[in-house]
């Protein structure tokens, strides 16, 4: 699970390259015991415009990648593709994948399923478990995280904690506050000790004249999702406190006890050496003039702010 735009799909391309072509990297340093096909249910990214270049950049064997999109299925049948549809089981039987990816899960759930309902989610995922058992394949379920602040691990998965319970392994992705690096934290492993957290960044690349992106391995850390979330919370609190203190210091040292917007902004920036903290305070955008009489407003504001196409199974490739 991860927030939108973190890079789930870009890292996922590295996994697909590993499964289809046996491509090793910092992400997957040991050769796989076997390689095979990947069946990708894509609910958001277009195969021709996005996925093909991304997978080529990662080194995937495109002859072993099969993509079924929610939009294309609806265009052909007039019905949304859901996990319970027999069509999905039929596609999987023809493809014989080693790995089945559902990205994201929300795009392939029946409309009447409430993700917060444990019973409904278990029933909705039963057909997927049956496919995995019949085909002998692994399943990767991709989810967006929720918008709750200050939560990590299990609490970050959108709506349904039951998915955490059913999954044998859970990965959480996020972005570090201090240096902006992306992390992939192994939060749960039902069969062994969770592995170290992977650090990565994303490079812009060009493949066959098409601009795309590629995940680049940076190293490992023992920090987990909760550590990064706590770091973000602490740094935000420190930034707000620094901004508040700087505003009060500048105003208290002013000879007139007041200062026009541009002068106050410049003085505060010099005081705290951080324009982002001032922006997050959002105080100056609300008041054209700050005075000592407005200190209570400054305190409150600083406290509240914070400074085309898809491949058929028969073709076994993306067109």
Predicted regions and their residues:
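The Walker A/P-loop phosphate-binding site
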Residues: 1-60, 172, 307-318
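Phosphate-binding/switch region of NTP-binding enzymes
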Residues: 5-10, 119-213, 297-301
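Well-ordered alpha-helical segments embedded in enzymatic catalytic cores
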Residues: 15, 87, 124-127, 246
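Conserved, well-folded catalytic cores of nucleic-acid-processing
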Residues: 18-22, 54-58, 108, 131, ...
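Conserved inter-motif catalytic segment of the P-loop NTP-binding fold
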Residues: 32-119, 123, 130, 220-224
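C-terminal regions of RecA-like/P-loop NTPase motor modules
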Residues: 93-96, 134-135, 176-319
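Conserved phosphate/pyrophosphate-binding and hydrolysis machinery centered on Walker-type P-loop NTPases
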Residues: 114-118, 157, 237-240, 258
């Amino acid at each position: 699970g991860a927030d939108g735009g973190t890079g789930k799909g870009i890292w996922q391309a590295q996994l697909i390259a590993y499964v289809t072509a046996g491509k090793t990297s910092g992400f997957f340093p040991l050769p796989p015991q076997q390689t095979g096909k990947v069946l990708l249910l894509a609910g958001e990214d277009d195969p021709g415009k996005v996925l093909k270049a991304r997978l080529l950049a990662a080194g995937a064997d495109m002859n072993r990648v099969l993509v079924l999109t929610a939009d294309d299925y609806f265009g052909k049948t007039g019905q949304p593709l859901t996990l319970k549809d027999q069509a999905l089981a039929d596609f999987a039987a023809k493809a014989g994948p080693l790995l089945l990816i559902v990205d994201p899960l929300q795009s392939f759930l029946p409309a009447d399923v409430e993700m917060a309902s444990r019973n409904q989610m278990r029933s909705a995922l039963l057909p997927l478990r049956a496919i995995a058992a019949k085909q002998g394949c692994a399943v990767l379920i991709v989810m967006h995280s929720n918008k709750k602040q200050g939560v990590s691990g299990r609490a970050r998965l959108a709506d349904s904690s039951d998915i955490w319970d059913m999954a044998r392994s859970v990965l959480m992705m996020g972005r570090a506050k201090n240096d902006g690096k992306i992390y992939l934290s192994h939060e749960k492993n039902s069969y062994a000790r969770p592995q170290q957290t992977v650090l990565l960044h994303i490079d812009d690349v060009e493949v066959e004249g098409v601009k795309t992106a590629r995940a680049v391995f940076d190293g490992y850390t023992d920090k987990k999702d909760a550590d990064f979330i706590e770091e973000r919370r602490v740094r935000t609190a420190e930034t707000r406190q620094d901004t508040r203190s700087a505003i009060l210091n500048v105003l208290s040292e002013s000879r007139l006890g007041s200062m026009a917007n541009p002068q106050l902004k410049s003085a505060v920036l010099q005081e705290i050496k951080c324009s982002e903290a001032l922006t997050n305070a959002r105080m100056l955008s609300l008041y054209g003039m700050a005075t000592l009489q407005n200190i209570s407003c400054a305190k409150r504001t600083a406290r509240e702010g914070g400074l085309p196409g898809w491949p058929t199974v028969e073709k076994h490739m993306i067109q």
